[in-house]
Amino acid sequence: MKKPVVIGLAIAAIVTVIAGGTWWYQSRQDDGLTLYGNVDIRTVNISFRVGGRLASLNVDEGDTIKAGQVLGELDHAPYENALMQAKAGVSVAQAQYDLMLAGYRDEEIAQAAAAVRQAQAAYDYAQNFYNRQQGLWKSRTISANDLENARSSRDQAQATLKSAQDKLSQYRTGNREQDIAQAKASLEQAKAQLAQAQLDLQDTTLIAPSNGTLLTRAVEPGSMLNAGSTVLTLSLTRPVWVRAYVDERNLSQTQPGREILLYTDGRPDKPYHGKIGFVSPTAEFTPKTVETPDLRTDLVYRLRIIVTDADDALRQGMPVTVKFNDEARHE
């Protein structure tokens, strides 16, 4: 009798375990997938593109910032001076280019022609004097030194005539294409320097790139700053994203566009609504910040969830429970 009783008890225990497991599995299926994540921390380090002395800051930590808002300014004076110099450089280059295009005036050509005539007369005189000196040298009336001096004077007069003739030829034919191109390039370079000076002056004003809340004010007016030095740190408040991770077994449930519910400790009975906006195409080891114990040794995929009804109570870094049950489709 004892043996049938033992067998019966064993069968009853097995049935109980199976029933309990079935109930647990069904309850897990009814509850849906649950993940744990955090509100994404999204910040921007705001800096001047140019360096200089910080003249003013118009905001403080905790202030609400609007895109396009003036946050602070550098000392403008050095950049205003540079802009004036750049404008003067453009004026000089423009004048030089215009001269190259216009060529030489009639008065300049006439002066060059007169210089040629004068140089020609000087050369003719030097040549005739040299010829006479040669005759005297043959009769040994003058010394070799006197003849050499006459030759040098003739050669110098010839060089002066050649230079005057070349100058007159240039005046009559106008400037070379290469010279005009060089003047044009100098003008374009001066204009580029002017544009850069205007941009540098514009960049002495610090403009908010987007809406947000000011987290930190790293420096104070009077500080000397290098280009790119962080002045302010802005927390981007919209849109609000939640970062969560899912293992490969449940990856099929996390399709982009799927609606889900997001719970926080501060309002457990009033969930936020969200949609999956991005699923990472590559797996990674579970980050240390993930709170789910059974995922800590798994390869997981990162999710970005866009909160569609976020408010100021949903702060960056806040832990969030992500529910994938069917309620999210009807809430």
Curated annotation (Swiss-Prot):
Cited InterPro entries: CusB_D23 (IPR032317), UPF0194_membrane_YbhG (IPR022936), UPF0194_transport (IPR050465)
Residues in the signal sequence: 1-19
Family annotation (Gene3D superfamilies): 2.40.30.170, 2.40.50.100, Helix hairpin bin
One Pfam match: HlyD_D23
A Gene Ontology term for the protein's cellular component: periplasmic space
Keywords: Coiled coil, Periplasm, Signal
Keyword match Coiled coil: yes
Coiled-coil positions: 107-208
HAMAP family linked to this entry: UPF0194
UniProt-listed NCBIfam families: PRK03598.1 (NF002939)
Protein name, entry field: UPF0194 membrane protein YbhG
Organism annotation: Salmonella arizonae (strain ATCC BAA-731 / CDC346-86 / RSK2980)
